[in-house]
Amino acid sequence: MGKQISNLYIARMESATKLATVQVLLTTPDYDWERGEFWVNEGPGMLRRGDDLFLTFSASDTGVSYCVGMLSAMSGTDLLDPLNWKKNRHPVLSSNYDKGIYGPGHNSFVKDEKGRDVMVFHARTETEIVGDPLYNPNRHAFLMPVVWGSDGRPVFDFDNRFEE
């Protein structure tokens, strides 16, 4: 059967249920960190700051190798052109054995009561998976403050804290 591959596509929408353009391949599992038992790019989340767009996605299989990758683009460019997106060569968030958080992924972004960006994601608190990993109940929701680096890019770190 070979590897099962999951890619991310982009298209302009005519409505909530209808495409206005043909779908375009945005990213496919290119790097080793995206190619665990399954070759996966899935679960995109979008974050915007100024003119910069950051699309995070989950990669690899759902065990300890599950992680978050990121693409970035400038708003105002043709987002349907894959050449306008730059893919990070390394995951922006991955398992942290010191913290006991494994396989972070499938994230989204929300704002807190002060308008600050917060990443919501799931991860495991154990490294061993019993049974089918997709149906194993050991995935929990986590919140992570998004801190912005001096280069204007988001920094995802388990030690992130907001300044009060």
Named regions from a protein language model:
Residues 1-164:
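Carbohydrate-active catalytic/glycan-binding domains of CAZyme proteins
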